[in-house]
C-alpha cells in the first residue's frame, strides 16, 4: 500500500508555476521499501496492482485527477521500482503514464527518479500533448558533502494551456474569464544553511531565471485572452526574461513536512528583480507564510491546523507574476488564479479528525475528514484593502494518509461563486 500511495505522488499532471511565482521543488517519493508481506495478508485488489520482482516491484496504477480549471483527467501509470542490489532501499523508479482529458486530449508522460544516497534525489519528467509539453529535471541534496547544507537545482521547459485570467483586482468578474497559454523556460538554484548545527532556523538563498511567453489558450467557449485584455496581451507579446534573487528565512518544528500533525512553520522571504541582473522588469516582493498544528490527544486523532499567508509586490511585474488567489493551496472554493493583484492575504483553518485506521500490507493507513473555513482577498496595497472583497469559503476534505509522506485527498469548497472540487495528492497546507 505504501508503494501504491507513493505512486500517487508521481501522478500529478502538467502544471504551471505555483501561486507563489518562484517555483517550489517537485515532490519526490520516498526511497524506503516496505517490508515484504505474506501474500495471504495482502488484499485482492493490491495483489492485482502489485507484482513483486527479484530486485523491486511492478505496479499497475489507475489515475484520476479533478481540477476546476482542467476538469477531469484519468489514465493509467505502470511503475517499475528497482531496489539496490545489496540492500532493500529503492534505487530507481520508472513511471510512464498515459492520461486523457476531454479538453486537452491524450498526454503520454515519462518520469524517472534516481537516489544516489539517502538524502539526495534526481527527478526527470517529460511529456507531450496536443496543446502542452514539458521537460523537467531536478536535483535535491539535503546533506551536501555530508554537511547540513542543502542544495537544489531545477530546470524546466513547460507549456501550460489551462491558465485563466479574469483581470486584476478583488472584484474581477467571471464574465471576463479568459484562457491563456503560458510557455516558459526556467531554472532555479537554491542553497540552504542552518543558523546553528541542528537549528530549527534556516536561511535559503535562491536564484531564479525564467523566460515566459503568453498567448491565447485553446479552450472553447471563452473569449480570447488577446480580445478581452488587449493591453495585457500586447505587454506579454514576445518572450519576457525575469531574473529574481530571493532570501528566505524559515523556522520549522513540524513532526513531518508533508503529513504534519503537530508543530509550527514560519517562512519569511524578500526577493527582487532588476535590469542590472538581466531582467526586463524591476520589482520586489516580500511575504510571510505561517502555519500551526495543534493535536488534541496523544494519538493525534484530532488536530487543528491553521495557516496565514501574506504577499506584497512593489514595482512593475507582468500580470502572470502577480499574486494569485484560488486553488487547492490558496482558497479552496475557486480555481487557480481566480483573483489576481499585487498583494494577497489568505487565512485557512481546518479540524482534522481521523475516523478510521486500517493496517494493510504492513502499512497503517488513516482515513480522516477535515471541515475547513477560509477567508482571503487580493489588493493593490494593504492600505486600500476592503472588507467587502474578502471572500469566505467553507467545505470539507476527505483523506487517506500513509505517514510520513503520502496523502490522497478530496477537497470540496463552497464560495460566493459556487462549488469547487479538487482530487489529488497532498494537504492544502
What is the predicted role of each segment?
Residues 12-61, 65-68:
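N-terminal periplasmic/intermembrane-space "pro-region" immediately following the signal or transit peptide
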Residues 44-51, 79-86, 114-118, 140-145, ...:
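Outer-membrane beta-barrel proteins
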Residues 50-59, 65-241, 407, 415-429:
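Gram-negative/organellar outer-membrane beta-barrel architecture
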Residues 58-60, 74-76, 106-110, 133-137, ...:
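Hydrophobic, lipid-facing positions within transmembrane beta-strands of outer-membrane proteins
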Residues 60-62, 94-98, 124-126, 151-155, ...:
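Membrane-embedded beta-strand positions of outer-membrane beta-barrel proteins
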Residues 227-238, 242-367, 379:
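C-terminal outer-membrane beta-barrel translocator/porin domains of Gram-negative envelope proteins
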Residues 383-429:
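C-terminal beta-signal and terminal closure region of outer-membrane beta-barrel proteins
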Amino acid at each position: 500500500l505504501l508503494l501504491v500511495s507513493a505512486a500517487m505522488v508521481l501522478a500529478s499532471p502538467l502544471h504551471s508555476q505555483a501561486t507563489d511565482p518562484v517555483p517550489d521543488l517537485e515532490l519526490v517519493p520516498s526511497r524506503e521499501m516496505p517490508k515484504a508481506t505474506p501474500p495471504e495478508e495482502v488484499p485482492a485488489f493490491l495483489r492485482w496492482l502489485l507484482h513483486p520482482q527479484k530486485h523491486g516491484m511492478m505496479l499497475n496504477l489507475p489515475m484520476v485527477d479533478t481540477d476546476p480549471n482542467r476538469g477531469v483527467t484519468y489514465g493509467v501509470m505502470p511503475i517499475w521500482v528497482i531496489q539496490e542490489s545489496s540492500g532493500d532501499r529503492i534505487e530507481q523508479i520508472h513511471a510512464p503514464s498515459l492520461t486523457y482529458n476531454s479538453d486537452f486530449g491524450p498526454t503520454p508522460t515519462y518520469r524517472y527518479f534516481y537516489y544516489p544516497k539517502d538524502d539526495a534525489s534526481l527527478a526527470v519528467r517529460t511529456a507531450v500533448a496536443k496543446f502542452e509539453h514539458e521537460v523537467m529535471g531536478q536535483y535535491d541534496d539535503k546533506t551536501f558533502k555530508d554537511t547540513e547544507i542543502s542544495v537544489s537545482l531545477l530546470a524546466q521547459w513547460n507549456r501550460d494551456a489551462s491558465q485563466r485570467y479574469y483581470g486584476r483586482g478583488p472584484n474581477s468578474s467571471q464574465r471576463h474569464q479568459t484562457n491563456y497559454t503560458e510557455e516558459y523556460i526556467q531554472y532555479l538554484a537554491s542553497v540552504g544553511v542552518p543558523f546553528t548545527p541542528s537549528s530549527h532556523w534556516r536561511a535559503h538563498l535562491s536564484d531564479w531565471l525564467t523566460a515566459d511567453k503568453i498567448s491565447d489558450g485553446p479552450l472553447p467557449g471563452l473569449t480570447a485572452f488577446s480580445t478581452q485584455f488587449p493591453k495585457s496581451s500586447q505587454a506579454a507579446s514576445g518572450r519576457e526574461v525575469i531574473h529574481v534573487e530571493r532570501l528566505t528565512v524559515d523556522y520549522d518544528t513540524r513532526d513531518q513536512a508533508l503529513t504534519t500533525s503537530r508543530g509550527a512553520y514560519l517562512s519569511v522571504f524578500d526577493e527582487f528583480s532588476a535590469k542590472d541582473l538581466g531582467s526586463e522588469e524591476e520589482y520586489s516582493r516580500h511575504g510571510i507564510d505561517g502555519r500551526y498544528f495543534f493535536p488534541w490527544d496523544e494519538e493525534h486523532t484530532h488536530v487543528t491546523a491553521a495557516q496565514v499567508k501574506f504577499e506584497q509586490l512593489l514595482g512593475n511585474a507582468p500580470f502572470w507574476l502577480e499574486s494569485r488567489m484560488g486553488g487547492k493551496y490558496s482558497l479552496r472554493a475557486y480555481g487557480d488564479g481566480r483573483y489576481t493583484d499585487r498583494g494577497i492575504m489568505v487565512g485557512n483553518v481546518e479540524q482534522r479528525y481521523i475516523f478510521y485506521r486500517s493496517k494493510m500490507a504492513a502499512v497503517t493507513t488513516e482515513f480522516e475528514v477535515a471541515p475547513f473555513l477560509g477567508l482571503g482577498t487580493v489588493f493593490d496595497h494593504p492600505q486600500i484593502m476592503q472588507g467587502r472583497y474578502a471572500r469566505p469559503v467553507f467545505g470539507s476534505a476527505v483523506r487517506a494518509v500513509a505517514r510520513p509522506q503520502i496523502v490522497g485527498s478530496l477537497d470540496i469548497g463552497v464560495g460566493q461563486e459556487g462549488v469547487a472540487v479538487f482530487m489529488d495528492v497532498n494537504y492544502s497546507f
